[in-house]
């Protein structure tokens, strides 16, 4: 009963009702700005304290946007994305090198110390540059559908939140959609657009939080 009220769309049909529903429309339709977007500085003024390790998840692009997201654990046991970096070589008409992105990362982090930088494993040259500069790197688990399901669960259960400053991430939550052409052939996959913040978010959640205590990721009632 508790899950029935929390899920909607394709997640509700598959995981609650056990139906094979076509994946269409907004992927994270459970994301609500009024619930998931918070003013971290205001919360800290009211008693939120960040504890333990901090992480950065990165979706790396050359022409496509590169995104850094900073993740911090609150004393309420929820995770907060407290800061966002977004740079598009295409939009800015100027690509950055691996070393320029690493310098941007250092400047963006300032005095913040991180446990790991979580990066898409395909970004080999960028990972090498990070390691050369003394960062500890964890290669992201890039399971797309399982990762999406976990992010959906974390959003639904109120375990992840985003600071008001994370503008591009908020935009992508509203425009990240299922690929309807693929769905017609029985394949679930997102449209490869408006997905760079979404990929970065998924990398962190699926790499670091999938074994988090108290989270049970729903599986479809019936396999296809």
What is the role of each PLM region?
Residues 13-14, 25-26, 202-220:
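Charged phosphate-binding loop/patch that engages nucleotide di/tri-phosphates or the phosphate backbone
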Residues 1-58:
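ATPase catalytic-site recognition across NTP-hydrolyzing enzymes
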Residues 49-73:
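Gly/Thr-rich phosphate-binding beta-strand-loop-beta motif of the actin/hexokinase/Hsp70
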């Amino acid at each position: 009963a508790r899950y029935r009220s929390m899920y909607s769309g394709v997640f509700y049909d598959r995981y609650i009702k056990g139906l094979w529903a076509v994946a269409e429309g907004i992927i994270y339709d459970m994301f609500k700005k009024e619930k998931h977007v918070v003013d971290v500085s205001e919360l800290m003024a009211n008693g939120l304290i960040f504890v333990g390790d901090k992480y950065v998840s990165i979706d790396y692009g050359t022409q496509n946007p590169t995104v850094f997201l900073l993740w911090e654990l609150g004393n309420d046991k929820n995770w907060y994305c407290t800061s966002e970096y977004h740079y598009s070589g295409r939009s800015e008409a100027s690509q950055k090198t691996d070393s320029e992105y690493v310098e941007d990362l250092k400047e963006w982090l300032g005095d913040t110390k991180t446990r790991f930088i979580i990066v898409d494993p395909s970004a080999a040259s960028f990972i090498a540059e990070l390691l050369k500069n003394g960062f500890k790197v964890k290669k992201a688990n890039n399971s797309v559908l399982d990762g999406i399901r976990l992010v959906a669960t974390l959003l639904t259960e109120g375990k992840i939140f985003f600071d008001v400053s994370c503008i591009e991430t908020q935009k992508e939550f509203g425009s990240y959609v299922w690929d309807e052409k693929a769905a017609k052939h029985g394949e679930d996959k997102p449209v490869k657009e408006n997905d760079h913040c979404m990929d970065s978010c998924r990398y962190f959640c699926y790499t670091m939080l999938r074994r988090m205590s108290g989270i049970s990721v729903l599986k479809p009632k019936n396999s296809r």
